[in-house]
């Protein structure tokens, strides 16, 4: 249960976030427990997470802001283990380095910055850039199909996620046939379609010449007979 100080501080920070949101981040407390916050990070552009939607939690101690929160990410990202406490300088792994003047917005900005770095930490995983991009494409499907807490905390995003998923599927369906029909013609097929390079066309040309010669000789004899 939150102390009066923690409750007052977290409510103040929530109102501040509503007034001045953090770029690429949405965050709010659970209605039944102000110490349990849920965040959504929108994958920053020009990163392997672009277009992704990453849901996670901040679990604050009852005596916040004097101690830092536990930070977890629920949506698979290829960057962090899911549902695992992350070792960050502003998380509960490092209470001695925590500064009580830091706020929820400070934590969220730091989390986005760390996520897009290559720094290794407890709770982090190492994957390729292509793997992270693959995860990013699947985040919205995961959140509405395999993440019940997301449905509770962010119901306003459900329909939008479904629309985005349907749109992505439609675009993929359009791209695949184009790729199939754009298969280049092989050199052998090109040669088959070049009439003057085929043996059959050469034979036809020889027969045409022979016929012309025959008619020329016949005409010569005909006119010679008349003379």
Swiss-Prot record:
One Gene Ontology MF term: ATP binding
Transmembrane segments: 207-225
Pathway annotation: Protein modification; protein ubiquitination
Cytoplasmic side: 1-206
A Pfam family recorded for this sequence: UQ_con
The UBC core domain, residue ranges: 5-163
Catalytic reaction annotation: S-ubiquitinyl-[E1 ubiquitin-activating enzyme]-L-cysteine + [E2 ubiquitin-conjugating enzyme]-L-cysteine = [E1 ubiquitin-activating enzyme]-L-cysteine + S-ubiquitinyl-[E2 ubiquitin-conjugating enzyme]-L-cysteine
SMART domains found in the cross-reference section: UBCc (SM00212)
Domain of life: Eukaryota
Gene Ontology terms describing biological process: ERAD pathway; inner nuclear membrane-associated protein degradation pathway; protein polyubiquitination
Major location category of this protein: endoplasmic reticulum
E.C. number(s) listed in UniProt: 2.3.2.23
Enzyme class: transferase
Active site: 87 (glycyl thioester intermediate)
General function of this protein: Catalyzes the covalent attachment of ubiquitin to other proteins. Functions in degradation of misfolded or regulated proteins localized in the endoplasmic reticulum (ER) lumen or membrane via the ubiquitin-proteasome system. Cognate E2 conjugating enzyme for the doa10 ubiquitin ligase complex, which is part of the ERAD-C pathway responsible for the rapid degradation of membrane proteins with misfolded cytoplasmic domains.
Similarity comment: Belongs to the ubiquitin-conjugating enzyme family.
Protein name: Ubiquitin-conjugating enzyme E2 6
Gene designation: ubc6
């Amino acid at each position: 249960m939150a102390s009066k100080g923690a409750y007052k501080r977290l409510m103040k920070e929530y109102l501040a976030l509503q007034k001045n949101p953090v770029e690429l981040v949405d965050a709010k407390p659970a209605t039944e427990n102000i110490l349990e916050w849920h965040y959504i990070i929108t994958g920053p552009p020009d990163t392997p997470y672009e277009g992704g939607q990453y849901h996670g939690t901040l679990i604050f101690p009852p005596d916040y802001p004097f101690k830092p929160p536990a930070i977890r990410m629920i949506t698979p990202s290829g960057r962090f283990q899911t549902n695992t406490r992350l070792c960050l300088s502003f998380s509960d792994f490092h209470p001695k380095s925590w500064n009580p003047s830091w706020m929820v917005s400070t934590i969220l900005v730091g989390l986005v910055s760390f996520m897009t770095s290559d720094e290794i930490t407890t709770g982090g995983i190492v994957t390729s850039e292509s793997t992270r991009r693959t995860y990013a494409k699947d985040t919205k499907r995961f959140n509405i199909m395999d993440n019940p807490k997301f449905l509770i905390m962010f119901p306003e995003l459900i329909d939008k996620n479904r629309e985005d998923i349907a749109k992505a599927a439609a675009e993929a369906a359009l791209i695949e046939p184009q790729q199939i029909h754009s298969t280049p013609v092989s050199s052998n097929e090109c040669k088959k379609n070049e009439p003057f390079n085929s043996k059959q066309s050469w034979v036809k040309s020889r027969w045409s010449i022979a016929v012309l010669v025959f008619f020329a000789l016949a005409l010569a004899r005909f006119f010679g007979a008349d003379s």
